[in-house]
């Protein structure tokens, strides 16, 4: 099994694209509008895993995403932490995550939790 992508339906399309592109450093991929009520954009990490953002223009409220977490590893963990502090998006400060990793959590514009993980 190979997990290919995670889909997030958003009411904050532009802010979400900026977060995944500029903060997480994901590469923009396919982007299209299958109809007049929807825009879709994909963002890919260095291993090929993708986040699919769907903006349904008919949807005005986001659903509860507090129980969703996306885990990401960063070689320059300190740089990501400083950028997250600057943006004011930290949900939880760095803490040990198991015996070998450190982790802090940020919120994307949709309220999805993104774990920023550094191997010890």
Predicted regions and their residues:
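Short hydrophobic/aromatic beta-strand element in the GNAT-like acyltransferase core
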Residues: 40, 50, 71, 103-105
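Short amphipathic alpha-helices within nucleic acid-binding modules
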Residues: 19, 78-83
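Short, charged/polar, Gly/Pro-enriched secondary-structure boundary elements
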Residues: 48-51, 62, 111-114
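Short, charged/polar surface micro-motifs in flexible loops or helix N-caps
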Residues: 46-50, 58-60, 77-78
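Short glycine-enriched loop/turn motifs at secondary-structure junctions
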Residues: 1-2, 62-67, 97-98
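Vicinal oxygen chelate
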Residues: 31, 42, 81-120
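N-terminal beta-strand motif that seeds the catalytic metal site of vicinal oxygen chelate
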Residues: 1-17, 68-72, 120
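Core segments of cupin and vicinal oxygen chelate
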Residues: 7-48
